[in-house]
Amino acid sequence: MSTPHINANPGDFAKTIIMSGDPLRAKLIAETYLEDVKEVTNVRGILGFTGKYKSKDISIMGHGMGAPSASIYFHELMATYGVKNFIRVGSCGAISDNIHLKDLIVAMGASTDSKINRIRFLDHDLAAIANYDLLQACIEVLKTTTVNYKVGNVFSSDLFYRPNENDYTLMAKYGVLGVEMEVNALYALAAEHQCRALALCTVTDHIVQHEHLTADERRTDLHEMVKVALETAIKI
């Protein structure tokens, strides 16, 4: 049975999915790393695929930009298609002096300026946190690599172009490592639907220091994150 935004058939999705904001990146990941790949959904250009990685069924799918868009796909995958394990791979802007370009942030929790979780949670603040089993599995994988990584909190913003950059000073004071747009929604929906979720963010920009990766560097270093996500996926 399809949903308004996903036209896959029952059973088309694996229990574990890796999600990216960019549907073309999802397509690239699927075609590069999976065997026996099948496209399972393509509504509104949001592409989803299922295949095998080291003999384990894995799905890859896009979700668009921002919490409202991403929440549609997270919800439908959880509520209708029975997907249980979510690993989001994406980029972020660093705000901490201890974080550098190309570092990988493993998002332990997500603060936000969005009201999306308050709407779900009786206008209370929800602690939007990663699943511990996924987090632990990811750290085990990272310890076998040369990837520079930090584990900590991110800030999920509704604004890509923030009008007051002084906000970042306060966030950094509270230990926030980087800013992105979807993690708080993913972790809240995973809690609501008793699923497991983890987000990985490669630092492609340093907001405070005004540093940016080139297009070629983004392509290469995001692949390192994807490999970590895939190896994490087969450990759970």
UniProtKB/Swiss-Prot annotation:
<keyword id="KW-0328">Glycosyltransferase</keyword>
<feature type="binding site" description="in other chain">
    <location>
        <begin position="180"/>
        <end position="182"/>
    </location>
    <ligand>
        <name>a purine D-ribonucleoside</name>
    </ligand>
</feature>
<feature type="binding site" description="in other chain">
    <location>
        <position position="25"/>
    </location>
    <ligand>
        <name>phosphate</name>
    </ligand>
</feature>
<comment type="similarity">
    <text>Belongs to the PNP/UDP phosphorylase family.</text>
</comment>
<protein>
    <recommendedName>
        <fullName>Purine nucleoside phosphorylase DeoD-type 1</fullName>
        <ecNumber>2.4.2.1</ecNumber>
    </recommendedName>
</protein>
<dbReference type="InterPro" id="IPR004402">
    <property type="entry name" value="DeoD-type"/>
</dbReference>
<feature type="binding site" description="in other chain">
    <location>
        <position position="21"/>
    </location>
    <ligand>
        <name>phosphate</name>
    </ligand>
</feature>
<feature type="active site" description="Proton donor">
    <location>
        <position position="205"/>
    </location>
</feature>
<keyword id="KW-0808">Transferase</keyword>
<comment type="function">
    <text>Catalyzes the reversible phosphorolytic breakdown of the N-glycosidic bond in the beta-(deoxy)ribonucleoside molecules, with the formation of the corresponding free purine bases and pentose-1-phosphate.</text>
</comment>
<feature type="binding site" description="in other chain">
    <location>
        <begin position="204"/>
        <end position="205"/>
    </location>
    <ligand>
        <name>a purine D-ribonucleoside</name>
    </ligand>
</feature>
<feature type="site" description="Important for catalytic activity">
    <location>
        <position position="218"/>
    </location>
</feature>
<feature type="binding site" description="in other chain">
    <location>
        <begin position="88"/>
        <end position="91"/>
    </location>
    <ligand>
        <name>phosphate</name>
    </ligand>
</feature>
<dbReference type="Pfam" id="PF01048">
    <property type="entry name" value="PNP_UDP_1"/>
</dbReference>
<dbReference type="GO" id="GO:0004731">
    <property type="term" value="F:purine-nucleoside phosphorylase activity"/>
</dbReference>
<feature type="binding site">
    <location>
        <position position="44"/>
    </location>
    <ligand>
        <name>phosphate</name>
    </ligand>
</feature>
<feature type="binding site">
    <location>
        <position position="5"/>
    </location>
    <ligand>
        <name>a purine D-ribonucleoside</name>
    </ligand>
</feature>
<dbReference type="InterPro" id="IPR018016">
    <property type="entry name" value="Nucleoside_phosphorylase_CS"/>
</dbReference>
<dbReference type="InterPro" id="IPR000845">
    <property type="entry name" value="Nucleoside_phosphorylase_d"/>
</dbReference>
<dbReference type="GO" id="GO:0005829">
    <property type="term" value="C:cytosol"/>
</dbReference>
<dbReference type="GO" id="GO:0006152">
    <property type="term" value="P:purine nucleoside catabolic process"/>
</dbReference>
<comment type="subunit">
    <text>Homohexamer; trimer of homodimers.</text>
</comment>
<dbReference type="InterPro" id="IPR035994">
    <property type="entry name" value="Nucleoside_phosphorylase_sf"/>
</dbReference>
